[in-house]
């Protein structure tokens, strides 16, 4: 069984989603996980790390160190389910081939539409002449990531009051 398939099968059984697997130098294996309803906390990473360590031992997976982490605020988007889940949020999208001389776009994700196998994802962005809508398929996508939203205003009234 392929490593990614092995990890994905294990995570699915545990109620998690595999976001990405990275093999780094010196035998480091990084696994990024998510959970649609609650997100991921450190205890989730510990639980997954312990389970994967056992699975890798049984399956004779060669690695030196295992890191399990959440995908972060700038989570990669790879599947139709990702684009459906994060519709309405801002993302940076890079296409394989340019559209009107442009490959990189930042805008609001529109949920995928179309027949199965022909789904198109929408991205509402600010074009040269105002708001525009980009439509693309997963096969046209090079990479996409959420744009982190950091709201420090919520902490303004906390702490020392003068």
UniProtKB/Swiss-Prot annotation:
Pfam families: DUF150_C (PF17384), RimP_N (PF02576)
GO biological process, one term: ribosomal small subunit assembly
CDD domains, alphabetized: YlxS_C
GO cellular component: cytosol
Alphabetically ordered keywords of this record: Cytoplasm, Ribosome biogenesis
Chief place of localization: cytoplasm
Subcellular location: Cytoplasm
Function, as annotated: Required for maturation of 30S ribosomal subunits.
Cross-referenced PANTHER family: RIBOSOME MATURATION FACTOR RIMP (PTHR33867:SF1)
Family designation: Belongs to the RimP family.
Record's protein name: Ribosome maturation factor RimP
Organism: Ralstonia pickettii (strain 12J)
Gene giving rise to this polypeptide: rimP
């Amino acid at each position: 069984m392929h490593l990614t398939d092995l990890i994905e099968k294990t995570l699915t059984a545990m109620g998690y989603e595999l976001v990405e697997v990275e093999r780094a130098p010196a035998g480091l294996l990084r696994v990024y996980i998510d959970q649609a309803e609650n997100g991921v906390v450190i205890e989730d990473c510990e639980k997954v790390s312990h389970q994967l360590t056992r699975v890798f031992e049984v399956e004779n997976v060669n690695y030196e160190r295992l890191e399990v982490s959440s995908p972060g605020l700038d989570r990669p988007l790879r599947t139709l389910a990702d684009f459906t889940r994060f519709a309405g949020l801002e993302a940076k999208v890079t296409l394989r081939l340019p559209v009107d001389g442009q490959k990189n776009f930042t805008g609001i994700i529109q949920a995928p539409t179309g027949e199965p196998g022909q789904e198109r994802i929408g991205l509402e962005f600010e074009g040269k002449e105002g708001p525009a809508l980009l439509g693309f398929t997963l096969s046209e996508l090079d990479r996409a990531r959420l744009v982190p939203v950091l709201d420090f205003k919520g902490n303004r009234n906390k702490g020392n009051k003068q």
